[in-house]
């Protein structure tokens, strides 16, 4: 049996967030829902403050944070930046209709590739992705490549390098979500 995962979701579409919640809870996971990026960061910050090192072996309050890329108040990218400042090891998964833009922004702004799910998608696809924790280590390897590209080029990857990153991310994410 898979361990129970703690998942924080920020999504302004209440119908979509309900689908995510039902799919995750059906597999025994604990879900915390927020409706915008500001609320998500506030909930995450409070969870970090309550976290004791002995509570969770990973020393992070959530196994995954799911962020809608385009949200009111604070968008997903800004929320991710704030969360990553609090905990650089936090697993972030963007849900977005704009995967290329999201990938480029995550590399430029977060200095790393994050997992992506292209809207629309079946909620079970997201659950499968969250449960596949092997993706995290493979993403770490991909992010080492991003760091090397950034060091060599003195900045962010160029257009052709983004295409390569997109292809590598597709291979890492076995679910074919992008």
Q: Which residues fall in each region the model found?
A:
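CheY-like receiver
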Residues: 128, 135-178
């Amino acid at each position: 049996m898979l361990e129970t995962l703690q998942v924080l979701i920020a999504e302004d579409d209440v119908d979509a967030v309900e689908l995510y919640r039902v799919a995750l809870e059906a597999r025994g996971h604990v879900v915390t829902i927020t409706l915008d990026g500001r609320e998500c960061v506030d909930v995450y910050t409070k969870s970090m403050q309550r976290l004791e090192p002995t509570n969770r072996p990973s020393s992070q309050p959530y196994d995954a944070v799911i962020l809608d890329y385009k949200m009111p108040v604070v968008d997903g990218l800004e929320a991710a930046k704030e969360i990553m400042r609090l905990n650089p090891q936090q697993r972030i998964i963007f849900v977005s209709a704009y995967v290329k833009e999201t990938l480029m922004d995550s590399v430029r702004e977060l200095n790393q590739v994050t997992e992506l799910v292209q809207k629309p998608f079946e909620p079970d696809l997201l659950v499968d992705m969250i449960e596949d924790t092997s993706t995290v280590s493979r993403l770490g390897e991909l992010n080492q490549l991003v760091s090397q590209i950034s060091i060599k080029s003195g900045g962010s990857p160029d257009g052709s390098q983004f295409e390569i990153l997109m292809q590598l991310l597709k291979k890492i994410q076995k679910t074919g979500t992008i």
